[in-house]
A protein has these predicted regions:
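A structural motif corresponding to the C-terminal end of an alpha-helix
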Residues: 37-40, 108-121
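Charged, often glycine-rich, active-site loop that binds/positions anionic groups
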Residues: 50-67, 137-138, 142, 280, ...
Length: 525
């Protein structure tokens, strides 16, 4: 075979959740690895716009969309909402009003995929059917329907009724596909009726007989999955954990591929769920963080890294309102160091694949300031950001160092404004906080000694000062909690001005203590 085909797809039933990017990144990385191994490959990505509209996302007006339940997604009007930023039309071009529901949400997702640097070949499921590319697969499935029904029963235990056919017709009268039932096939046309066969949509009560070809019908999805393997010649296609379990959809599709279509199914790469804050995502219900929302919180290389650095068999638990993002940056930085040291192991490979092939400059060595320290510095208007980064680096900054620092500052501000935990947020107060008045005498005396310590050691670095503070605490015999809570309340701004983020990082690593008030100690002592 000249070109190996890697494929993935997503149904555009609503705002597509970030978990769907795991499949995108895995398949994109496989395609790249094949190409680098001198094995030509193509990465096909399908926006499935032919599935029935079966649920209304919570953020849409139910009364407005209820009458469209049961229609193919491409036949449902686009929501009357602002066009998603960067969304692409079916022809791959930017701008314009999305022509239907599937294009509204699918276009938004395609824009995220392109931003991540994956050169996928996008297509729509409706085009496969309407252009006749699925005709042979439909004919074979209809003629071998009893075999498909037997496979369903043997794999999952689900018994199909007599004369069952694995297709849904698009009703000639109401245009719905989710409410029809195929009754018989005479070799040319399928007889069907449109009724109340599902709980989520209402049929028109009519029926007829029509050709199932050229978009008149679609295969039911497990049979359709195998048919796409057959029609597109797919060699690699992974699937989520829920589909890849024993007796699941993938096992059924693989058997249909072999026994009905006479082909070997593609290599499967089962991958685990992506949780946001411990919850599994749902596209059609509008539950969870969308791909676009998370893509706005992280630069492309970090989002790619997030999807790659854990084994596909492990759950990714991502909580932007906790420590996940600072920890993710720290992990990325450790992988970068391994790559720059000339390592050839998994860390170095994952770091390289976290950058698009076209981004060779992004692989160049640079200073990587800790994200948690950057998040602190951007909240300190009295500090010159790049000067503080230079102090951390211990050398003059090159252009790539500045670019990296400024990118991290941009995303740190975005994170702080949207969802960062309170412990990462700081505010310089202009008036004495009420809590400062409650400091006990021993705390005030301790602060006076700290002031003297600072004045006596004006050039001490953060690490040295950290040690001297511990010595002072021991000498005074003050409880650690009382000593450090007074420092947090009254002293941190002074230390930040004098020692910059270097002190902040070392200090907070040892003494994480939630607070939101910073006040100069000299007001108290």
């Amino acid at each position: 075979k000249v070109t190996l085909v890697v494929r993935d797809e997503k149904t555009a039933s609503g705002r597509i959740h970030v978990g769907s990017l795991r499949g995108v990144v895995i398949h994109g990385a496989v395609s790249r690895a094949l190409s680098e191994a001198k094995l030509p490959s193509a990465f096909f990505y399908e926006i499935n716009d032919f599935d029935p509209f079966d649920d209304i996302p919570s953020f849409l007006n139910r009364e407005e969309f209820e009458r469209h339940l049961g229609k193919p997604l491409f036949a449902v009007p686009a929501p009357d909402l602002p066009a998603p930023a960067g969304a692409l039309r079916a022809d791959g071009q930017a701008g314009g009003t999305p022509e239907n529901y599937a294009e509204y949400f699918g276009g938004e997702f395609i824009a995220v995929i392109k931003r991540l640097g994956f050169a996928a070949e996008f297509y729509r499921a409706s085009a496969l059917y309407r252009e006749g590319r699925m005709n042979d697969a439909i004919r074979i499935a209809l003629l071998r329907a009893p075999l498909i029904a037997r496979i369903y029963e043997e794999v999952s235990g689900a018994k199909r009724e007599k004369n069952w056919l694995p297709v849904s017709l698009v009703c000639e009268h109401c245009g719905k596909i989710g409410t029809t039932k195929a009754l018989s096939f005479d070799g040319e046309r399928v007889k069907y009726e449109c009724g109340n066969f599902v709980e989520w949509a209402v049929g028109c009560g009519r029926g007829g007989a029509m050709s199932p070809y050229n978009g008149g019908a679609k295969l039911l999805w497990k049979a359709e999955w195998a048919a796409k393997f057959f029609v597109l010649g797919v060699d690699v296609e992974g699937a989520g954990k829920d589909h890849s379990t024993k007796g699941g959809a993938r096992e059924i599709a693989d058997r249909i591929a072999r026994e009905v279509y006479g082909i070997e199914p593609p290599v499967n790469i089962p991958y685990e769920f992506f949780h946001v804050g411990g919850r599994k995502m749902s596209t059609s219900r509008g539950a969870g963080a969308s791909a676009r929302e998370i893509a706005e919180l992280l630069p492309p290389k970090l989002l790619r890294f997030l999807m790659l650095y854990k084994d596909p068999a492990r759950v990714i638990d991502f909580d932007p309102s906790a420590d996940t993002i600072p920890n993710l940056y720290d992990t990325y930085d450790s992988y970068a160091e391994e790559f720059w040291k000339g390592g050839a192991g998994d860390y170095a490979k994952i770091f390289r694949f976290s950058h698009p092939r076209a981004d060779a400059r992004g692989l160049g060595e640079r200073f990587l300031p800790r994200f948690s320290e950057v998040a602190y510095l951007v909240q300190m208007p009295h500090l010159e950001f790049l000067k503080e980064i230079e102090k951390m680096a211990g050398r003059s900054l090159m252009a790539e160092d500045k670019q990296e620092a400024e990118e991290r500052a941009f995303y740190a501000r975005r994170w702080l404004e949207s969802c960062a935990p309170e412990k990462y947020k700081f505010e310089i107060q202009k008036a004495l906080p009420a809590a400062a008045k409650a400091l006990r005498e021993e705390q005030r005396k301790a602060l006076a000694r700290v002031r003297a310590l600072l004045e006596a050691n004006p050039m001490a670095d953060g690490q040295t000062l950290h040690g001297k503070l511990h010595e002072l605490k021991t000498e005074l015999g003050i409880a650690p909690k009382d000593f450090f809570s007074a420092l947090y309340l009254s002293l941190l701004v002074t230390l930040a001005v004098r020692y910059g983020g270097n002190f902040y990082g070392q200090f907070l690593d040892y003494h994480l203590f939630p607070f939101s008030i910073i006040f100069p100690f000299w007001v108290i002592v």
